[in-house]
């Protein structure tokens, strides 16, 4: 009797998705041979909702280790909308369960971030056999020390900061680099340290613009003709941190500065007189070939997930804890975010180096 394994990639793409898919497939084929069939669910949960899936040939998993993006396609399907019946009159949860049954799946592997894991847990609670795999450049999935895609994004953001140094120095400017990360500052913290940023601003540590401006002025007085700010896109001021999201987004809109980076740059320029510019690498941080580290990590996660399938161990997500690959119950991690804690070792490293955290 053959086992039918469904695989989908959901949410934003990142380096390592294809490497993980490959790890799962190769490990399954090696372990089960022709007793396993892999069904590709196209474009994330949207494909599961609308019955968009296909049988995959073993040859499709060759040559994708180094390829960025995802061969299955992906789409954001917000968790908060899963129970909402829209204008199309589709009950999304019922539709996903129907596709699972029609495709004759024995289990479903969901590669994605926090939203993906919330939906994976929902499906698990609805009785489906589900396994999650942690993907995000934000590195903010609860219960795992690292997610695939993170290290490649750190490499990319670091290179951006590296390249900004020379132009900042040549023009005696303050350069604000906006790094991805709405709720967690891991990517900004790591790339900021790796790239030699002078000021690092992350969502978990609300900044005081006076301290930011003071850090720039202190560098100028010390003979430094430029400053580099690594700013998480989700950075909040001390004042904003006291408000509800709707309040501070409205205030930003009123001021004309919709992003934290834009406002910080204008404020620093006004307060210090230093010419200030913004650099937004944006989606470059989630594109391209995965780093060697992420290829290894993705392969580890994929092979471990294949083992879970073989052992009929469902309702969990793969994780790296203290350098060991393991599995956490979906119900224990869904809906939780792994933020940068106040006692984070890398925050202490930044402080010890004289890097301002605002």
What residue ranges belong to the model's regions?
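Short, ordered loop/turn segments at secondary-structure junctions
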Residues: 10-13, 41-46, 76-77, 113-116, ...
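A cross-family phosphate/adenosyl-ligand binding-site feature
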Residues: 1-9, 20-104, 115, 236-242, ...
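Short, glycine-rich nucleotide/cofactor-binding loops
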Residues: 8-18, 180
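Short Gly/Thr/Asp-enriched flexible loops that form oxyanion-binding sites at enzyme active sites
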Residues: 20-24, 114-128, 188
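Accessory alpha-helical/coil subdomains and C-terminal extensions
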Residues: 99, 110-112, 120-122, 150-171, ...
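Flexible loop/turn connectors
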Residues: 298-310
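Short, acidic/small-residue loops that bind anionic groups at enzyme active sites
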Residues: 32-33, 123-147, 151-154, 201-208
